[in-house]
């Protein structure tokens, strides 16, 4: 279901990331096997089972999924909150993982060389046109631009 690709991205040891596949999971038919979206018509219990499996594999209880709207909105998560209406989230809270779902959009994962935060961006053409990436970087000014590490999926 998930694969760890540490070699693709030079990041601090306190940061982990995973890229999921559709090879295993509880979803069926057109939703493949490991669907994590409640918005596409898959059975809710299948999606929740897939999310629970992901939490177990990653050993984390709080995975924050965005309610991706194809906008330029970004938000910092100080406390765990799921389904925030945004297309970019970041957190400095070590007990929260950030998740981005894509089909034909581009996922970006962001941290800095110290691993002081983790974030992700859902970049579709509407978000790119309305400066989602610029808005995200405007919200993480606590980290120097030269210290940032970005993985484009």
Where are these regions (language model features)?
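A generic structural signal for short beta-strands and their flanking turns/coil linkers
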Residues: 32, 62, 104, 146-148
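Conserved nucleotide-ligand handling architecture
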Residues: 1-19, 23-24, 29, 85
């Amino acid at each position: 279901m998930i694969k760890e690709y540490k070699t693709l991205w030079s990041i601090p040891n306190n940061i982990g990331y995973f890229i999921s596949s559709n090879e295993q999971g509880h979803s069926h038919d057109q939703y493949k096997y490991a669907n994590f979206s409640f918005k596409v018509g898959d059975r809710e219990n299948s999606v929740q089972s897939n999310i629970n499996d992901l939490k177990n594999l990653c050993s984390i209880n709080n995975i924050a999924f965005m309610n991706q709207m194809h906008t330029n909105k970004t938000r910092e998560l100080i406390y765990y909150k799921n389904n925030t209406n945004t297309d970019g989230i970041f957190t400095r809270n070590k007990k929260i993982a950030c998740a981005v779902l894509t089909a034909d959009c581009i996922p970006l994962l962001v941290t800095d060389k110290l691993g002081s935060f983790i974030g992700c961006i859902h970049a579709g053409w509407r978000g790119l046109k309305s400066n989602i990436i610029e808005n995200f970087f405007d919200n993480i000014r606590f980290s120097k631009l030269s210290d940032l590490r970005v993985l484009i999926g």
